[in-house]
């Protein structure tokens, strides 16, 4: 089975370079959630499931803020970041305007590598994606890459209420099913509630969202005897694997360190669900 993060026993390290990006546009999609487009050469290297570090301009704030890549434009000259304001750094980002410059670090992490995934797993006929909350944006680029490969996915996205940010974007690339906590749109409940109301029979599950959701996805995949790939989100410091601040427990020992650990920022953020303890 295709395993993320390791090829021939060696961890894959993404190319990393600090660069200056230019703000192309920014808008608020929902309360506290912003849609930011950045012009950057790093877009040429970006893929589904990866992320960049965005540096605040405040000199007192040294560390970049990790933000998942939502989308890469067609000519690979710009990155789309959809993020939630969660602290001083992201609050500063929400004030960016067209023409502003910002320092970024990337491209970071190991993502889905769609072409390799599909080549190694021809049995993945019904590909299903699951996004919850701010875990929704990273699934858009994955949907886009799957559709480009001729494998339009079934996409299950979960919201708190009727603020369905990015729903229309997902509809360009796959069949979309919505779940809302308050029942205002679609299925009342979560993404798995929505799945069980359809005739969709997944051959693989791919997810990003709250930890409770990821645990449920892992359990559902286990019961169906199919693989699940989950994108883990964790507080990060360096973003390049040096500080060990984003380690997760694994079910297997690392061949080199001989410990049951993996760094989310380098070996992840995408993991085969059965290989991590969550």
Q: How would you label these PLM feature ranges?
A:
Residues 25, 71, 178-180, 230, ...:
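Structural signal for conserved beta-strand scaffold positions within catalytic alpha/beta enzyme cores
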């Amino acid at each position: 089975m295709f395993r993320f993060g390791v090829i021939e026993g060696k961890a894959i390290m993404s190319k990393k370079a600090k660069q200056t990006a230019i703000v192309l546009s920014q808008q608020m999609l929902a309360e506290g959630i912003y849609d930011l487009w950045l012009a950057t050469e790093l877009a040429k290297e970006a893929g589904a499931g990866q992320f960049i570090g965005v540096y605040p301009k405040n000199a007192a704030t040294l560390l970049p803020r990790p933000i998942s890549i939502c989308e890469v434009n067609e000519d690979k000259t710009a990155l789309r970041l959809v993020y939630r304001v969660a602290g001083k750094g992201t609050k500063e980002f929400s004030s960016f305007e067209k023409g502003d410059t910002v320092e970024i670090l990337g491209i970071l992490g190991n993502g889905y590598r769609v072409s390799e995934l599909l080549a190694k797993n021809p049995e993945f006929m019904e590909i299903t994606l699951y996004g919850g909350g701010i875990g929704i944006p990273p699934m858009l680029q994955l949907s886009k890459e799957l559709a480009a490969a001729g494998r339009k996915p079934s996409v299950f996205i979960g919201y708190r209420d009727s603020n369905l940010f990015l729903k229309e974007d997902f509809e360009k690339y796959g069949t979309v099913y919505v779940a809302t906590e308050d029942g205002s749109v679609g299925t009342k409940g979560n993404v798995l509630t929505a799945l069980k109301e359809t005739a969709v029979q997944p051959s693989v599950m791919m997810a990003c969202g709250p930890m409770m959701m990821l645990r449920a996805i892992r359990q559902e995949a286990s019961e169906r005897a199919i693989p699940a790939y989950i994108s883990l989100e964790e507080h990060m410091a360096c973003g390049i694997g040096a500080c060990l601040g984003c380690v997760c427990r694994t079910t297997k020992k690392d061949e080199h360190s001989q410990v049951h650990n993996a760094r989310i920022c380098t070996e992840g953020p995408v993991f085969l669900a059965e290989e991590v303890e969550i």
